[in-house]
């Protein structure tokens, strides 16, 4: 593994530990060059409560690796969280910079009613 990836995983591990101490559900994201994925995971980490990604049928037809697609995923995860009765989460950016697609997903989720 490259040093860059090792550093990202170290940051992610530290963040997840802090979120676990808070005892709230977390909005975890994963980013690849082609897709972006979002999951809401229960406070104890045992269940995935809601998911959304650019692989969903609604988004698969268009561009999937850009800021616009990430915004749509953010809106979709917020809607699915509301349907599951979740309004407040902790944002787990998985060690990625809060910039570009990560920021677009977070902003769209906030605009659609998810609090973090």
Curated annotation (Swiss-Prot):
What keywords tag this UniProt record?
Ribonucleoprotein, Ribosomal protein, RNA-binding, rRNA-binding
UniProt KW Acetylation keyword: no
Q: Which GO terms describe its molecular function?
A: 5S rRNA binding; structural constituent of ribosome
GO-annotated biological processes: translation
Q: Which InterPro entries would you find in this protein's record? A: Ribosomal_uL18_bac-type, Ribosomal_uL18_bac/euk
Q: Which GO terms describe its cellular component?
A: cytosolic large ribosomal subunit
Question: Which SUPFAM superfamilies does the protein's record reference?
Answer: Translational machinery components
Superkingdom of the source?
Answer: Bacteria
Subunit-level organization: Part of the 50S ribosomal subunit; part of the 5S rRNA/L5/L18/L25 subcomplex. Contacts the 5S and 23S rRNAs.
Instruction: Tell me the function of this protein.
Output: This is one of the proteins that bind and probably mediate the attachment of the 5S RNA into the large ribosomal subunit, where it forms part of the central protuberance.
Protein family per UniProt: Belongs to the universal ribosomal protein uL18 family.
Q: What is the protein name for this chain?
A: Large ribosomal subunit protein uL18
Question: Which species is this UniProt entry from?
Answer: Hahella chejuensis (strain KCTC 2396)
- Upper classification of the organism: Bacteria, Pseudomonadati, Pseudomonadota, Gammaproteobacteria, Oceanospirillales
Designated gene of the protein: rplR
